[in-house]
């Protein structure tokens, strides 16, 4: 099987990144915050020290910026708090710091829901991210994110965008995981996931359905490893790979989350996987499908897929 070397390198980055994210000093504090016009997450973040957790309740009507100097902190909405970004020219949450965890919030409004940029590192866990003016989650400018256990839906653009030489682990924490921590990415106005501009992603165990364009688009000299995901009912193809890019759809054999192929139960509007403009696909086709068939490759593409469904 042809190997995608950038994916292997990216797995090492996942492990290294998580070691950074999970390292915290011994004297960590939990600070409680009930959002109000006076008591905001933005003000509280300025006072956090490495290892601290900000435990948030209520509805926070603000656009939150987590600056580069903020490291190794947790923002915890406990599954109840909401952050609504009133300024639609800026993200609801932007992360430039490292070792930042955002979990348990409903995130709405803003230009984008959560943006990790300028070398930021973040874990985005167990949030509902919806109703933004553009992307649900964006990772760009050589940044790194683990995106797990979220519902990302009803955003006007892509559910998740990875760009600018960045890397994302979508649906798992580390390459040692035996089970996925899946996201549901649905009903977004463009692609479910877009990996572009020389970026890499490993996408495992997610449900990616009913997005207006493709389930997953990989383009502009990018690579993605896409496995064990259900890719259903998208408005174009399940997976679209183009512009000198490549996808790896699991291994030739094996049943683990990183080896198993993807599935389609409700056909995508075009094909299961489409390939154009000097791109490639390797691994197992699984049951990826669309109303126009399983796949469509132009003459410039390299097709190394094993086509036996379900193997």
Question: For the regions a protein language model found, what residue spans apply to each?
Answer:
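Acidic Gly/Asp/Thr-rich repetitive segments characteristic of extracellular carbohydrate-active
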Residues: 30-57, 61-65
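Bacterial N-terminal signal peptides that target proteins for export
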Residues: 1-12
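C-terminal segment of classical bacterial N-terminal signal peptides
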Residues: 16-25
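Consensus "Asn ladder" position of solenoid repeat domains
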Residues: 105, 127, 132, 150, ...
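Extracellular beta-strand-rich solenoid/capping regions of secreted or surface-exposed proteins
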Residues: 61-74, 83-121, 135-142, 162-165
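Extracellular beta-strand solenoids
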Residues: 33, 56, 66, 77, ...
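All-beta strand scaffolds that present successive hydrophobic residues in beta-strands
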Residues: 74-77, 100-103, 121-125, 144-148, ...
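Structural detector of coil-to-beta-strand junctions
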Residues: 63, 90-94, 113-115, 135-136, ...
């Amino acid at each position: 099987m042809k190997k995608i070397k950038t994916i292997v390198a990216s797995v090492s980055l996942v492990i290294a990144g998580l070691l950074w994210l999970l390292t915290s000093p011994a004297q960590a504090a939990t600070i409680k915050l009930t959002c109000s016009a006076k008591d905001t997450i933005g003000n509280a973040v300025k006072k956090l020290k490495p290892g601290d957790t900000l435990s948030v309740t209520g509805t926070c009507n603000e656009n939150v910026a987590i600056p580069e100097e903020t490291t190794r902190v947790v923002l915890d909405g406990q599954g109840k708090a909401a952050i609504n970004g009133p300024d639609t020219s800026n993200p609801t949450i932007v992360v430039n710091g490292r070792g930042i965890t955002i979990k348990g919030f409903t995130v709405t409004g803003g230009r984008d829901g959560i943006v990790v940029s300028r070398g930021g590192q973040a874990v985005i866990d167990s949030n509902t991210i919806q109703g933004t003016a553009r992307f649900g989650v964006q990772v760009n400018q050589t940044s790194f994110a683990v995106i797990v256990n979220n519902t990302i839906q009803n955003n006007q653009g892509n559910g998740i965008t990875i760009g600018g030489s960045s890397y994302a682990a979508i649906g798992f924490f580390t390459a040692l995981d035996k089970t996925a921590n899946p996201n549901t990415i649905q009903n977004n106005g463009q692609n479910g996931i877009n990996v572009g501009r020389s970026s890499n992603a490993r996408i495992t165990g997610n449900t990616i359905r009913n997005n207006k364009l493709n389930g997953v688009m990989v383009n502009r000299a990018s690579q993605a490893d896409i496995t064990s995901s259900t890719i259903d009912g998208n408005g174009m193809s399940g997976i679209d790979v183009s512009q000198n890019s490549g996808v790896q759809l699991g291994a030739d054999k094996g049943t683990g989350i990183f080896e198993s192929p993807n599935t389609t139960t409700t056909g995508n509007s075009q094909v299961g996987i489409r390939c154009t403009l000097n791109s490639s696909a390797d691994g197992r086709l699984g049951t990826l499908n669309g109303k126009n068939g399983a796949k469509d490759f132009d003459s410039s593409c390299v097709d190394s897929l094993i086509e036996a469904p379900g193997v």
